Amino acid sequence: MAETLGLAAIGDEQLTRRYADIVRQEYLAVGIREALSPQADLATEPRWARISGTFGEDPTRVHNMVRGYIEGMQNGTDGLVQGSVIAVVKHWVGYGAAENGYDSHNVYGKNAIFSGNNLKEHIYPFTGAFEANVASVMPTYSILKNASIGGKPLEPVGAGFSHQLLTDILRGQYGFKGVILSDWLITNDCNSDCINGVPEGKEPVPGGMSWGVENLTPQQRFVKAVNAGVDQFGGVTDSQLLVNAVNEKQLTQQRLDESVVRILEQKFRTGLFENPFVDPQKALHTVGRADWQKEANAAQGRSLVLLQNKEGVLPLKRGKKIWLYGIEPKAAQIAGFRVVDSPEKADVALIRAHAPYEQPHKQWFFGRRHHEGSLAFTDDNPDYQAIVKASHAVPTVVTVYLDRPAILSNVKDKAKVVIGNFGVSDAVLFTRLTSSEAFTGKLPFELPSSMNAVLEQQSDVPHDSQSPLFEIGFGLAR
């Protein structure tokens, strides 16, 4: 299936619901009863490392996609019922306004910055989850820097410790009655390796994400989070500190009972006690069904965004000689093309590229996994070198995987065809490139024209960069 950005590029709420419904059935078949999804985060900072899990940066579209996703995952609009998988919408709230694009799994990315005073717009997509009666909410690790509600500044702590965000706004203003599940390890310490990165030769491990409350003890963090509104702690298997807090009269048993009731109610509503087992044979016949894969392939094709098609290069004609980069030769051969070993021998070149990124924080556990930094293709980028090489010799088709909004200025002027993708197989790509049907995918975020424009935009405001190369919602038909 197309990734969530691809579903946003399609823009069909019912398709998103269908996608989540299929996932629900596969999850249930193998015994998964809770999903840490969807992300309702608004991807307003184009450098952010976790855009690929979102539905983009248009508040209305994200709202609608989130609503459809939860209805599919929970088997309807009435909250948890038999056949539901518990959906956990995340990350409440403002996670996508990541300062400098750095993610708050890391100490160097613990802040989301609200210089545009735009928290209200980040809240709006979550109302789609509330309309679908979402079962659970996960707060963000991030400290919302410069953010305020009703003119009152937010306490500078991660959302899992914020009474304002969890009790006053989420439960009070929006009437959320479900489970608040913290993100993982928010009560753990961030030690020196977590703060400074590991020395050369040492393997990094996850540290704690107790942003804003680093001066508290782990037990004090548990108390503060529970008092803020947290019901359940992600990644915690030892409850002794909570027991100690009750025994020391820092928390009441009545308050813990409120959380226990919420958690148990979910288990009862989904039938987990009555029917905790799965049938392995049924699972084998459910997961990866051929008819579902056919639907998934169709969605992948619909999610492709045609950004440029010069000189009528598309659709590609079968039988042509083709030079490939990042594409399996067998897929091209099955599609009816003759694969050659140099652009000079080809009629056309097809290149699969990845949105550019940097990894300046490889000494951190999550930093070494995250795509950070510049969005621009540079001369030493291997994908860009392939584009330059091919475009000197032959009409070139480039498809760029847009896990972040790449700057395509120096790709657009070399390639005849440019296509944005959000996860597409080689087979589906060839089916689409040889089809005469119109493209229907639209960009779920804008593509900036330069890194200067990226640096000047406000991290909490959607699609606000100066003179974008491609505006949000852009997509050619042919």
Enumerate the predicted regions with their spans.
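Structural recognition of the beta-strand scaffold that forms the well-ordered cores
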Residues: 25-28, 33-38, 43, 85-89, ...
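C-terminal non-catalytic regions of proteins with extracellular/luminal or membrane-system context
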Residues: 29, 186-190, 215-218, 240-253, ...
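Second-shell residues forming the walls of enzyme active-site clefts
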Residues: 57-235, 240-241, 254-255, 262
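Sec-exported extracytoplasmic/periplasmic mature domains
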Residues: 24-32, 70-78, 127-131, 171, ...
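Helix-enriched interaction subdomains in cytosolic or periplasmic regions
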Residues: 54, 246, 254-256, 260, ...
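Glycine-rich tight-turn/loop motif centered on a GG-T
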Residues: 2-13, 46-65, 101-120, 147-160, ...
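Extracytoplasmic/secreted envelope proteins and their assembly/folding machinery
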Residues: 20, 24, 63-70, 123, ...
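Active-site-adjacent structural elements in enzyme catalytic domains
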Residues: 8-35, 60, 64, 68-71, ...
